[in-house]
């Protein structure tokens, strides 16, 4: 029985922790970045204790709640209020089995019926199934679904829609099929799901229409640079990943340097590991990188309101810090010898949970190519 499997139990425990933690926290989603700055700084600290909890909170407040705030309009405010109180749990359904980084080619469709003021959401192919959707397998009531908007035979590109996944009894809505993605290398407390839409009907108002809408005559109307504006609003989430990755690096270095000072090896009078140049050569460059990354992250946070550079700052933070964190964790694990391999060192668990940071919210190698566009 699925509900008695260790994987399910692990997810229930994380969800209970999530609810308990948020019962002590009052967070308001707003369009200004003041509260967002506080949230990502909080995420930074929680990375030291529970990366899974950070991911689950980020899905609820950043990927779901903040996206409605940034891409929606006043008519969507009720979703934000219920997200803050956890009456609604949401998820972010962009990635598909066949497409991740290339969102322009997403295959999920949203076909507009003007006479009925409705959209029909459909995943016509296996490759169009929404996949790796955090909080989607078990808990999310709603999803922000990114789909190609069709009016008649004309495609107007990728747009975000609110689609209900489950009712109050946690039963899937009509024509919505949800599967569990199963075990992962890490973050197994987070319920990643596969979501299939078989011509699911949603009302017109479920279109997040800050940058594009359909007028009373059925004509499509969009602001100039719609897609780039939409993606820029979403890019800030990567900055939190950069901060979290770097604080993990700092933790690993602190533990390793403490060990290296106390641990003595070789010679008639044994010397601390840190006194050896070969050891310094391994650890000190990583320490220097962590300081530089920290300074850059603080700079990026202080310039969140400048959307002209935030997109690129967040890319630099995520890529530099996530890659450096994995390098640091591995070097620190080896630098602590067998003790670094012990479960209580936390190095191994952190590595497994952080590994995906180089991929989700944008593959690092692909993201770096966007830096060339910065002027």
What are these regions (language model features)?
Residues 114, 118-178:
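A short core secondary-structure module
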Residues 1-48, 232-375:
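Alpha-helical interface subdomain recognition
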């Amino acid at each position: 029985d699925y509900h008695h499997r260790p994987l399910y139990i692990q997810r229930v425990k994380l969800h209970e922790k999530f609810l308990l933690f948020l019962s002590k926290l009052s967070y308001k989603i707003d369009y200004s970045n003041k509260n967002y700055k506080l949230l990502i700084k909080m995420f930074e600290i929680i990375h030291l204790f529970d990366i899974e909890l950070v991911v689950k909170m980020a899905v609820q407040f950043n990927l779901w709640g903040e996206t409605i705030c940034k891409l929606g309009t006043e008519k969507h405010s009720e979703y934000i209020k219920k997200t803050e109180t956890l009456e609604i749990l949401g998820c972010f359904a962009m990635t598909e089995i066949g497409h991740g980084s290339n969102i322009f080619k997403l295959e999920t469709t949203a076909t507009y019926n003007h006479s009925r003021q409705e959209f029909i959401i459909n995943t016509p192919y296996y490759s169009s199934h929404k996949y790796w959707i955090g909080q989607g397998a078990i808990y999310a009531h709603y999803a922000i679904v990114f789909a190609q908007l069709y009016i008649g035979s004309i495609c107007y590109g990728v747009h975000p829609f609110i689609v209900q996944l489950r009712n109050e009894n946690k039963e899937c809505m009509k024509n919505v099929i949800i599967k569990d993605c199963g075990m992962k290398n890490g973050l197994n407390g987070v319920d990643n799901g596969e979501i299939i839409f078989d011509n699911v009907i949603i009302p017109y108002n479920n279109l997040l229409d800050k940058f594009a809408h359909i007028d009373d005559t059925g004509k499509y109307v969009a602001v100039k640079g719609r897609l780039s504006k939409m993606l820029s609003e979403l890019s800030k989430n990567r900055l939190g990943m950069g901060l979290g990755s770097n604080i993990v690096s700092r933790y690993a270095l602190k533990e390793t340097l403490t060990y290296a000072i106390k641990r003595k090896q070789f010679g008639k009078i044994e010397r601390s590991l840190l006194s050896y140049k070969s050891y310094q050569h391994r650890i000190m460059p990583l320490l220097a990188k962590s300081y530089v990354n920290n300074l850059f992250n603080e700079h990026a946070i202080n310039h969140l309101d400048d959307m002209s550079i935030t997109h690129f700052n967040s890319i630099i933070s995520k890529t530099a810090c996530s890659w450096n964190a994995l390098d640091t964790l591995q070097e620190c694990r080896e630098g602590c010898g067998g003790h670094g391999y012990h479960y209580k060192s936390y190095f191994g668990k952190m590595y497994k949970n952080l590994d995906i940071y180089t991929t989700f919210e944008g593959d690092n190698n692909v993201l770096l190519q966007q830096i060339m566009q910065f002027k």
